Amino acid sequence: MMNRLLVFLMLGAAFMLVVSAIDQDANEDINKRGIPCLCDSDGPSVRGNTLSGIIWLAGCPSGWHNCKKHGPTIGWCCKQ
């Protein structure tokens, strides 16, 4: 009985370690890149065009500029 409990705890710990590592990597990617948006210079449509802007909720930070005349409903579409 004790061996089964120990095996169960070890498998649970290994699972939690893997899940926490995957989640941490996903958060780092979002922090680095943000949510992409379509700048006016990208073209009229999302299809086939790269999304070169990033949505910022509290305005564009220093070194960035608003790249869309009519921005997204929430936040600003900014480009470096």
Swiss-Prot record:
Location (main, coarse): secreted
Pfam family, one: Toxin_4
UniProt keywords, alphabetically: Cleavage on pair of basic residues, Disulfide bond, Ion channel impairing toxin, Nematocyst, Neurotoxin, Secreted, Signal, Toxin, Voltage-gated sodium channel impairing toxin
Endpoints of the signal sequence: 1-21
Xref: InterPro entries: Myo_ane_neurotoxin_sf
Cellular compartment(s): Secreted; Nematocyst
Top-level division of the source organism's lineage: Eukaryota
Propeptide span(s): 22-31
GO molecular function, one term: sodium channel regulator activity
Assigned GO CC terms: extracellular region; nematocyst
Tissue spec: Expressed in gland cells and nematocytes.
Cysteine pairings via disulfide bonds: C37-C77, C39-C67, C60-C78
Family: Belongs to the sea anemone sodium channel inhibitory toxin family. Type I subfamily.
Comment field (misc): This protein is encoded by at least 3 different genes. At least 3 other genes code for a similar Av2 with a Val (instead an Ile) at position 35.
Its job: Binds specifically to voltage-gated sodium channels (Nav) (site 3), thereby delaying their inactivation during signal transduction. Has a strong effect on crustaceans and insects and a weaker effect on mammals. It strongly inhibits D.melanogaster sodium channel (DmNav1). It strongly affects the heart sodium channels (Nav1.5/SCN5A) and weakly inhibits the brain sodium channel Nav1.2/SCN2A. In vivo, when released into the medium, this recombinant toxin induces impaired swimming, paralysis and death of the crustacean A.nauplii within several hours.
Protein name: Delta-actitoxin-Avd1e 1
